[in-house]
């Protein structure tokens, strides 16, 4: 069944069901959860096979310990709670002396791969960021790139990889759950992923997952074999 869809279509399906689930418009059980995991994994595997020649690893000694690239699946205004969370994080990174590059990959409910599906939606994009190269939050200024929401994942990935090979960050911080671009970048450079909801682990293929709280006693066995960073 999954072989009937290409990578863009599979990722589109996964994103739409993520939205429906967040809005409590569908209920999932273990079987449907596992199906969604297979959909995401299949999409990732196809993308990886098509792009692996571009994903050459950047050795640690070539990367700048003071530089971090932050990828986010969506960046809107200050009334948008996930955007406020991201701003808090990048401001702290700057206080720690890091040079931070922010990239909005615009992957939140992207239109690429669109197929007929129940109640579809496309993620919002802040028009004022479209041609911006610098973004200011209060007194703090950051280098910035917003990738066109019309680009496919493969084109988004090429754009991010150009930046990464130019600035050579020590690592990538991916904010938001289910960033295919960040998951693929993790093949070239260490990538830590963090959900914008503090209490949840992000959905990611990358091994480094950040949890925005301490691990509870009853979770220790579940997380024992995961590389979970508490923050």
Segments predicted by a language model, with ranges:
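Short acidic, S/G/P-rich loop/turn micro-motifs used as interaction or catalytic elements
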Residues: 74-79, 107-110, 150-153, 178-181, ...
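Conserved nucleotide-sugar phosphate-binding/catalytic loop shared by glycosyltransferases and other
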Residues: 114-153
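Short His-Asn-centered micro-motif
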Residues: 71-72, 104, 173-176, 194-195, ...
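N-terminal subdomain of nucleotide-sugar transferases
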Residues: 1-124
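Short, charged/polar "capping" segments at the starts of alpha-helices
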Residues: 108-118, 125, 181, 201, ...
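Short N-terminal targeting/anchoring amphipathic segment
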Residues: 69-70, 161-178
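Structural alpha-beta junctions
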Residues: 91-102, 136-143, 187, 226-229
